[in-house]
A protein has these predicted regions:
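Small-residue-rich segments within alpha-helical transmembrane domains of MFS-like 12-TM solute carriers
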Residues: 23, 27, 109-117, 146
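Intracellular juxtamembrane helix-capping segments at the cytosolic ends
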Residues: 113-127
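Glycine-rich segments within core transmembrane alpha-helices of 12-TM secondary carriers
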Residues: 130-149
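Residue-level signature of mid-helix packing/kink "hotspots" within the transmembrane helices
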Residues: 27, 54-63, 146
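Pair of pore-lining "gating" transmembrane helices in MFS-fold secondary transporters
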Residues: 5-34, 38, 106-107
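Conserved MFS/SLC helix-loop-helix module at the cytosolic interface between two early adjacent transmembrane helices
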Residues: 60-99
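Hydrophobic core of transmembrane alpha-helices in multi-pass small-molecule transporters
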Residues: 88, 99-114
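Juxtamembrane helix-start elements in MFS-like secondary transporters
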Residues: 33, 37, 42-51, 134
Length: 149
């Protein structure tokens, strides 16, 4: 079934919005980290470990997402892997022990990586792998990241 021009535009716009919001959300950790260091007396090593676990989770999403898609539909995999994001962000505010923070930030990294995979895949699919739209997608991430600054 052929996708209409309006549907293509809708998918593209939603992907741009998602990346814009993703850029803003990742900035949250840059804002939260100094407060965590001060209030929880975290060492710079522990704080850097949190950022490392975010990056490791992001990398692991490339392995986890295809496995989930193989076990269930792609839409269900998106729902299952997106659920930890708001839960972990909320739990981050409760002052839990550092090892729990590592697990939560790892799950946030997996979810963030999954968002990247899905958005890139959707843009490639509806635009016929147009580099122009992929570049604009990543531009919206940067705008979302720097706009709150």
């Amino acid at each position: 079934m052929e996708i209409t021009k309006e549907d293509k535009r809708s998918v593209i716009d939603h992907c741009y919005l998602t990346y814009f919001i993703s850029g803003m959300v990742i900035l949250i950790f840059g804002v939260i980290l100094p407060n965590l260091i001060e209030e929880r007396n975290l060492s710079f090593t522990a704080a850097g470990g949190l950022l490392s676990f975010l990056a490791i989770g992001n990398l692991c999403s490339s392995l986890v997402y295809p496995v989930f898609c193989g076990m269930m539909s792609q839409k269900m995999a998106v729902v299952v892997l997106a659920i930890p994001y708001p839960m972990c962000l909320f739990l981050f505010t409760l002052g839990l022990p550092v090892p729990v923070l590592y697990v939560m930030i790892f799950l946030i990294g997996i979810t963030k990586g999954m968002i990247t995979i899905i958005n890139n895949h959707a843009i490639r699919q509806v635009t016929g792998s147009s580099n122009q739209y992929l570049n604009l997608l990543h531009m919206w991430y940067a705008v979302g990241f720097f706009l709150p600054c």
